[in-house]
Amino acid sequence: MNKISVLQVGNEDLSLQLHIPDFVEWNYINDLRLAKERGYDVCVLNRCVNEKEARILLKKIRAYTLFLLDDVNVDQWTTWICTSRRAKVLDIRTLQEFVNDDIQLFFSYTYGEKYDPHSLSISQNFKGSVFWDGFNGVELEGDYGDDFYQVAYWRGNIPVFQGQTINFWLEYEKDDSVSIQLKIEQFQSGSLSSLQNRWIFTEEDLSSNVYVTNNNMDGPVFVSLLAKGKGKLKIVGLHDRHSRKSYGEFLPGGVRMVSSKREEVFMYFDPGDMKPPLNVYFSGYKTQEGFEGFNMMRKMGAPFLLVAESRLEGGAFYLGDDEYEKFITTGIQDCLNQLGFDRSQLILSGLSMGTFGALYNGCKLQPHAIIIGKPLASLGDIAVNERISRPGGFPTSLDVLVKNCGDMSQKSIDSLNHHFWDLFDQTDWSQTKFIVSYMLEDDYDMTAYNRLISHIDDVGVEIIGKGIHGRHNDDTYSIVAWFKTQFDETLKLDFKRGDLDEE
């Protein structure tokens, strides 16, 4: 188990009164000027802090990792840092219990993944029809019998270490006449016969995340799907994530929203110094699940919101039904409301797939600025380019087309393109500036930048662009460097903020 670094600030060293597990590194510091580590996983505060100390804590600890003991009578700056870091009040009488049971959930890394659909096998005993639909899932139809039996299983077991908790989330669709269960079995490492844990989850259990905690030896888990009844069953995807239980998704404080179609979107809000603007960053395509851009956005010092999703392979461009898309716009607006900001104090940003999230939701929110790198706008054209311009380069684009339009016809290609551009053309951009870096020979969406310019009809809209030679993924370093520089300039010039925090 990785070490958990704890910073305790107070007039006395509480570790002398506690039993500290081997995996906890307890750092008692009363003078915060002596806090040399770049950051800590958890902070326990049992005295008030002044302004200088509050500013140090802002740099040293992440939001949602500050715990204020309940016997502290808070003052102005203690209240300020507790608000910024989204502190929780902890009963001093339960501190030992917290150290024993919960502090291990504040590990510094994040990890999540979707089982590769190629690792999904259908049971040989199933005699019905099977239709494979890329990363959109596999559709089964037939008679599964009167009792639960294995209809599918995932090859490639994942390790679960002693004391570790793993979340599982199953995306599926089915007829009411079909019932399912998820079975997870754990074996001892190096053995396929020594079964040490078995969990069976019902449909009611599967309405939310299910998790397994390994209190035995290290060992891999094998996952299978059981079914009974008769009808259609679509297995969309199975996700496994290192769990923080009630403390958040991926990061402490991470929020997970799920639509009635079992589609997820994730958000992480850090209030920063609680001064404008609110910087929103949409994660790009990635197969390892979780939030992107945390360190980059945090160094800016301002409030920020990370948005991520894990549908298909690496993401589905934040497109969905009204319920799903409303999660995103409502989530952003809620953060603005918490801060007391309006949309003139909002910046939407992203790279590659994240640019579509920024542009698409920008149509609905009309922010102060949209800062993007490697823009992708015409999703239908991106799918078309998979055939000739970029064979095998981004097959997810084909899944996105089928997911939203049902097939890969020219009519569907045009429809997916128009879905974005029609909304873009109806938007009042008069109060928004666009800052865009793009690849001159982009093989994903080669017309995105020029079309953005040609579709902005509002007089006086500021557009700053920089073209870099290469295909879509040829020079990400230069794109990101310019992206950061322009973000810095926007914060300085438009919001009178200082240099980025280089801490």
Describe the function of each predicted region:
Residues G301-G314:
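Conserved alpha/beta-hydrolase
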Residues Y109-G253:
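Beta-strand-enriched, solvent-exposed domains that form extended recognition/catalytic surfaces
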Residues Y318-F341:
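Alpha/beta-hydrolase active-site loop
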Residues K275-Y285:
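Short beta-strand element of the alpha/beta-hydrolase
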Residues P391-G465, G470-D499:
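The feature captures the conserved acid-bearing segment of alpha/beta-hydrolase catalytic domains
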Residues G10-I56, K261-D270, S415-F420:
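A short, well-structured beta->alpha microelement
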Residues G340-S352, F356:
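Alpha/beta-hydrolase fold nucleophile elbow
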Residues C363-C405:
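Hydrolase active-site cap/lid region
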